[in-house]
């Protein structure tokens, strides 16, 4: 391919504060339309904004996490434009003096890591929402007006659609680890605009870019960028000219369509907001927030390998989400077996979460109860097969694994005499299979094990069953 893709991303991260950026209204998603409002949200005359301190702290957290320089003083500015869902006629944002500048995000794209530079992270407020699907009219819901956002702007360092998706996934992971956002793309907590252009390989100058909006999933980000790249190439190869514009991604049709001409900074007539004082971040605040930062995914992954001895793959899976990593460590504290805890969390726990569309916080089995279940397996009190039955029962109540085993009579049978009697009965009932085994069809060993376990309702100690069978079959 003679063309090189060039992409820069603008990510809007909605903060999970209880109140809005410049007033005390709730930020709760899903409330009835126009109920999370006040004179500030509605831009009523005389209503003055007051900056939410938590918004500043969250911006500093993300800035530190991405290696940015934190400005001791930054300015809130008015971004002026008209839209029906923007009551003030301007959006409070930052322009010439943002709170965070010059950071970096390292992404893993499978065949190695790449560093994507960040131009800036700045504070801004969200706009309202236009609702077009009620009859023939358009309605305005201003609940979202003033909800705090951080806009993260990257340099045009991204060269493939896969890198763009990896960047967005990494950013989502970081904001979730920091606890500043839930990163939910479907609800709009994490939104992404892509500035896409192409140029000849080896060229220094960037091509004319288009901005792509309305990408609400990682997969759609990849598809939209791929489509737009090919659209640019087709136009250039056909002798045409790329128009700098904003385009909307249509996931149903798998294409972008023109939305409006691309605005420039001067179109918004930015100027410092006279109603708001500069945002100050002193050294004491900076150091306090630095000490509050969590252990980040890469560091935690390395520690899981070195401290617990689990494989790098397991450590990578367990640390993708902070809550899963926390759950694993609390489970391990109880059971003391890192590999067993890893297998259960990655296996049965994650399977259940996926099947039931649950978050780990909603999962019925606490890590302490799961640790108790794994401990019973380690002591030989129950088999893995029985443990899976107990696991299902634990989701329907608060009983411990031990209580369920006692109540249901599921304790493992390790009595050699009882197992020998069962083995003898199975061998007597299957003379053909016994003869075939002794003639060399040794794969039938698994058949006999299965028959014994079924006869004893899965409660027999598998190791004892294996030992008794070997002595009977090979003796």
Swiss-Prot record:
Entry's Gene Ontology molecular function annotations: asparaginyl-tRNA synthase (glutamine-hydrolyzing) activity; ATP binding; glutaminyl-tRNA synthase (glutamine-hydrolyzing) activity
Stored InterPro entries: Asn/Gln-tRNA_amidoTrfase_suB/E, Asn/Gln-tRNA_Trfase_suB/E_cat, Asn/Gln_amidotransferase, Asn/Gln_tRNA_amidoTrase-B-like, GatB, GatB_C_1, GatB_Yqey_C_2, Gln-tRNA_amidoTrfase_suB_CS
Pfam family, one: GatB_Yqey
Example GO BP: glutaminyl-tRNAGln biosynthesis via transamidation
Highest taxon above the source species: Bacteria
E.C. no: 6.3.5.-
Catalyzed reactions per annotation: L-glutamyl-tRNA(Gln) + L-glutamine + ATP + H2O = L-glutaminyl-tRNA(Gln) + L-glutamate + ADP + phosphate + H(+); L-aspartyl-tRNA(Asn) + L-glutamine + ATP + H2O = L-asparaginyl-tRNA(Asn) + L-glutamate + ADP + phosphate + 2 H(+)
Recorded coiled-coil stretches: none
Keywords: ATP-binding, Ligase, Nucleotide-binding, Protein biosynthesis
Subunit structure: Heterotrimer of A, B and C subunits.
Family to which the UniProt record says this protein belongs: Belongs to the GatB/GatE family. GatB subfamily.
Annotated HAMAP family: GatB (MF_00121)
Function description: Allows the formation of correctly charged Asn-tRNA(Asn) or Gln-tRNA(Gln) through the transamidation of misacylated Asp-tRNA(Asn) or Glu-tRNA(Gln) in organisms which lack either or both of asparaginyl-tRNA or glutaminyl-tRNA synthetases. The reaction takes place in the presence of glutamine and ATP through an activated phospho-Asp-tRNA(Asn) or phospho-Glu-tRNA(Gln).
Protein name: Aspartyl/glutamyl-tRNA(Asn/Gln) amidotransferase subunit B
Lineage, uppermost ranks: Bacteria, Pseudomonadati, Chlorobiota, Chlorobiia, Chlorobiales
């Amino acid at each position: 391919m003679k063309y090189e893709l060039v992409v820069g991303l603008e990510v809007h991260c909605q903060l999970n504060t209880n109140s809005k950026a410049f007033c005390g209204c709730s930020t709760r998603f899903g409330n009835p339309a126009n109920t999370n409002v006040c004179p500030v949200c509605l831009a009523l005359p005389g209503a003055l904004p007051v900056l939410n301190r938590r918004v500043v702290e969250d911006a500093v957290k993300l800035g530190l996490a991405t290696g940015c320089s934190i400005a001791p003083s930054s300015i809130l500015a008015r971004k002026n434009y008209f839209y029906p869902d923007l009551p003030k006629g301007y959006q409070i944002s930052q322009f010439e003096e943002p709170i965070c500048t010059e950071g970096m995000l390292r992404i893993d794209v499978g065949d190695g890591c790449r560093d994507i530079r960040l131009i800036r992270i700045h504070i801004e407020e969200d706009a309202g929402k236009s609702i077009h699907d009620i009859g023939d009219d358009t309605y305005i819901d201003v609940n979202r007006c003033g909800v705090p956002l951080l806009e993260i702007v990257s340099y045009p360092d991204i060269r493939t659609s896969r890198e763009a998706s990896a960047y967005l996934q990494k950013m989502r992971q970081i904001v979730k680890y920091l606890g500043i956002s839930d990163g939910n793309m479907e609800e709009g907590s994490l939104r992404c605009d892509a500035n896409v252009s192409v140029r000849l390989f080896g060229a220094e100058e960037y091509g004319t870019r288009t901005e792509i909006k309305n990408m609400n999933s990682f997969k759609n980000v990849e598809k939209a960028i791929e489509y737009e790249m090919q659209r640019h190439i087709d136009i250039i190869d056909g002798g045409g000219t790329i128009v700098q514009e904003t385009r909307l991604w249509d996931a149903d049709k798998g294409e972008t369509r023109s939305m409006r001409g691309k605005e420039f900074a001067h179109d918004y007539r930015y100027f410092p907001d006279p109603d708001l004082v500069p945002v100050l971040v002193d050294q004491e605040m900076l150091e306090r927030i630095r000490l509050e930062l969590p252990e980040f995914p890469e560091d935690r992954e390395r520690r899981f390998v070195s401290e617990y001895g689990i494989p790098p793959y397991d450590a990578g899976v367990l640390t993708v989400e902070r809550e899963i990593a926390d759950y694993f460590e609390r489970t391990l504290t109880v059971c003391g077996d890192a590999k067993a805890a890893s297998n259960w969390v990655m296996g049965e726990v994650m399977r259940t979460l996926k099947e039931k569309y649950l978050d780990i916080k909603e999962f019925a089995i606490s890590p302490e109860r799961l640790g108790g279940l794994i401990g019973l397996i380690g002591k030989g009190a129950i088999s893995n097969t029985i443990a899976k039955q107990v696991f299902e029962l634990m989701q329907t109540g608060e009983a411990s694994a031990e209580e369920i085993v006692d109540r249901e009579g599921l304790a493992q049978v390790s009595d050699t005499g009882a197992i020998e009697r069962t083995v003898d009965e199975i061998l007597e009932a299957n003379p053909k299979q016994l003869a075939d085994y002794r003639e060399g069809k040794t794969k039938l060993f698994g058949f006999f094990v299965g028959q014994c376990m079924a006869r004893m309702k899965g409660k027999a100690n598998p190791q004892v069953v294996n030992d008794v069978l070997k002595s009977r079959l090979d003796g």
